[in-house]
Amino acid sequence: MRIPVVLIAATVLAGVVTGSAAATAPAPAVPSTVPSPVVTGPIPATSRPGDPSHGYPFFATDQNLRAYGYVEEEYFVGGTANRYTTPDGATGTVIDGNHEYRTRIVVRRPVSPRKFNGTAVVEWYNVTNTFDYEVVWSRSFRHLLEAGYVWVGVSAQATGVHSARGLKAWSPNRYGTLDLTDGGTVGEDALSYDAFSQAAQALRHPRGVNPLSGMKVRTLIATGQSQSASRLTTYANSVHPLAPVFDAIAIVDGGVALRTDLTTKVFKTASEYDVLSNQAARRQPDTDRFVYWEIAGASHSDRHAYLVNNPIRLRDAGVSGLLAGPTAPCVAPARSNVPYEYVLDAMFDHIVGWVRQGVQPPVAPRIEVTDTSTRPATANRDAYQIIKGGIRLAAVAVPTERNTGWNTGLTPDRDSACQQGGTWIPFDDTTLRELYPTHARYVQAVRQVTAQNVRDGFLVSADAEATIRAAERADVP
C-alpha cells in the first residue's frame, strides 16, 4: 500500500518536513468502543442507472470507474445505536441505547489492493434537498481515484432515508428495510451519529461482510459539506470524543466553532461565500490539531460541482440545481469557476501526512474581511471586484473573469441559491488585452502563480499541470 504524496516538493521547499516531526508523530486512532455493525451485501443492481425500476444504488456514479481500476458497491449496515445529548462545545452523554437501525453505505474502491493508498474518505451525505447528495465526491472524485483513496458515502440521516424524496420512497424494493427511526420511535435524526461512527467501524473492523474486500485501512477521514458539515461539527464537538473512530475530520463550508481541546485532527475549509456568510466571525487560529483555509473567489455551490452532479440529480431525484451562467435567475451570471476542488485535493493529501507522519499542513492567508457585522461581511476587493486575501489560485490571481463567492437572486425565493452560487463573469476583450498583451504573457503569469501555490502546499502537482494546460488552451487575450 502506498501513501499519497503530501506535496513533497512543496513541503520540502517550505521547510515543513523534518526527521524529528516524523519521529514524534502521533499514532493513528486506536480501535474504539463503537460496535461494528452487521454488514450485508454487496446489494446487487437489478437494473442500469436511469432505469425507472430504480434497481440500482441511488446516485450511482456516472464516472468511468473502470478506467481508474475502481468499482462501486452498495452495502447495508445495521445494529443498535445510542441517542446523545449534544451540548454546545462540550462532550455529550448517552441518553439511551439499543435503538435498532439499518442504513446503507456506498463504497467506491480500487479493485486491486495494490492501488489502495490505505486511506478511506467517509462522506456524510448532505440532505438539504431531502435526498442523499455527495458534494465532496463531486468536487474531488478525480484526485481520490487517481491517488488510490477509497470513498464511502454514508446515509446517516433519516431525512435521506424516510422523506418523500428519500431512499425508501425512491425504491421500496431496494431500500424498504432501511430504518433510521427505530420503527418510528426516534426522531430528530438522533441515531445519525452512531450510524456514522458504526459505518466507519465497519471499514476497519468489519463484522460479517468486509465492504473493502479485505483491504486494510490505515487512515479514516470523515468529511461533509454545508448541511452535513454542520452535523459533522456537532459530531466532532460532542459525540466523537466519547469513542473516536476517525483519525481526522475534514469540514467543508459549514459548522460552528470547533472545540480547542479536541484530540482528533480537524481540517476546515471555507469558500468565499461561507467566509462572508458566517465563518469570518467564527475564525480560529491554526494549532497542532486544527487547520483552517479560506479560498478566494470560491463559492458554496460552484460550477465544477454542478456540472459533475447535476446530471445525476436530474436522473435520480428529478430536480436540477441552480443553472450555471447567465441563464440562472440571479443578478449576475451564476456559479464561480474557481476550482475549489483543487484545494480540497491538497487538503486530503495533507491530512494523510498529518496523521501518519505528523507533518503539519501549511498555514493559509485569510480573506481580507473588514467588518463582520454586515451580511455579507465586508471585505477588501481589487479594481475588478475580486476579493483580496485567502488562498489565491490562478483563477483569481491571474483572472480572465470575475469569480466571486456571493450573488443575489432576481426574486426573494431564489436569493439563497444565488448567494451560494456566487458569480462568474468573463472579462471583455478590452480588459483581457489590457491585462495580458500577449498569450505568452498570460500563460507565464499562470505558471508563476501556480508554481507558488504548489510550493505553498495549496495545490497538488496534477492539478497544477491541469491549470497550466487550461491556460495554454485558453483564448487569451
Model-derived features with residue positions:
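Secretory targeting and sorting signals
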Residues: 1-26
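C-terminal His-loop and adjacent cap/lid subdomain of alpha/beta-hydrolase
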Residues: 27-477
